A protein has these predicted regions:
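Conserved "turn/edge" positions that cap or connect secondary-structure elements
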Residues: 1-352
Length: 352
């Protein structure tokens, strides 16, 4: 983990006694204050008695401890991956093919949430009446307040609107127990193609996802992948993979990440018409400001020089001030000559 203010780098995938993991670790997620880091790992030496495959762990950087997250409410070990954590580090959502609660009888991977304070594990990928999905659920995300879980699935039994095997985006409210179909248009009609990889604002109001569906917005009539935002309060769905002038992207857009308040969404796009600074089909990082419908190129270097190669894996900080991404570009900073993918951070170009 890199502390950008102190200029220090800390190894996170270690046991409580500081022993380095004996296998691969990845997919980290960090609490708002940086104290807790959850990650998945194939290592068997991070906690005592771990002999299974991939698990989710949590590192407390202040206490210097590492704990296993993928357990049931009786502390019986399971397995899992793809963690997503609440701002305070109390709740950790993860994806698991294990039966960690009695109600999970579908024999398929599902989304779970671990409450580290109460020591309980609950199933999140289920319908409002508690019915588990009838097919595969993909890894999802947890809202910053720990209340909402979003994911995409091919299940047809989570909503009366869903009667096909397309991938659809859902949101589960852990407080009310209700589950809501998200990949719908403003009129409430379900998307006519699959939708993928949602992310959610801290309060659960805004959910961003991408889809090739052509009926989610009147601005979209092609089958290219585009990024949309669902406003659950106003029941609207908005196309955001478009330029500041409202011109829709002419190539694929995907992989959104949303700020805590839902104002900013970053995403990847191969479109060449989203910014006057971009005239090629390389994958670039963009920031869309929902408050004024502006779209700005973010994968730029000194003097706003556009990256000379592909960028990928983008995310935005909770406060919306910093955008991080991976890039093969060698002109984003001085003396980047290794010819490999590197991790970069830039100030949100929309924020002055």
């Amino acid at each position: 983990m890199r502390d950008r203010y102190l200029g220090t780098t800390e190894l996170i995938s270690v046991s409580s006694d500081g022993t380095k993991s004996n296998s691969d670790s990845g997919r980290p997620t960090v609490s708002a204050d940086g104290r807790y880091v959850a990650f998945d790992s194939n290592a068997t030496n991070l906690v005592p008695g771990d002999t299974r495959a991939t698990d989710v762990f949590l590192r407390d950087r202040l206490a210097g401890t590492t704990e296993l997250v993928t357990v049931d409410s009786n502390e019986v070990k399971g397995s899992g991956s793809s963690p997503s954590m609440s701002n305070d580090g109390r709740f950790v959502a993860f994806w698991s093919g294990e039966q960690l609660v009695n109600e999970d009888t579908n024999g398929r991977p599902d989304m779970y949430v671990r409450d580290r304070l109460s020591g309980t594990t609950s199933l999140a990928s289920k319908s409002s009446d508690g019915t588990v999905g009838n097919t595969l659920t993909q890894p999802g995300r947890l809202s910053g307040n720990g209340r909402f879980v979003v994911w995409h699935t091919g299940s047809t039994n989570h909503s009366p609107l869903d009667d096909d095997s397309l991938w659809d985006v859902y949101l589960h409210d852990r407080q009310s127990g209700t589950t809501e179909l998200i990949s719908v248009n403003t009129a409430g009609e379900k998307g006519n193609d699959s939708s993928f990889h949602p992310c959610v604002s801290d309060d659960g109001r805004f959910v961003a996802f991408f889809s090739p569906a052509t009926n989610l917005s009147p601005e979209d009539s092609d089958d290219l992948h585009d990024v949309f935002v669902r406003d659950r309060v106003n029941s609207t769905t908005t196309l955001i993979s478009k330029s500041s002038l409202g011109v829709k992207g002419n190539d694929w857009s995907r992989s959104p990440s949303i700020s805590a308040d839902g104002q900013f969404v970053v995403y990847l796009s191969n479109s060449s018409n989203l910014s006057p600074e971009d005239g090629d089909s390389l994958s670039d990082v963009y920031v869309h400001d929902l408050s004024n419908s502006s779209t700005t190129l973010a994968s730029v270097g000194v003097n706003r020089t556009k990256g000379d190669s592909v960028s990928d894996y983008t995310t935005i900080s909770g406060d919306g001030l910093v955008v991080a991404f991976v890039s093969l570009a060698q002109n984003l900073i001085f003396n980047d000559t290794n010819g490999r993918f590197d991790v970069f951070t830039v100030r949100n170009p929309v924020v002055r």
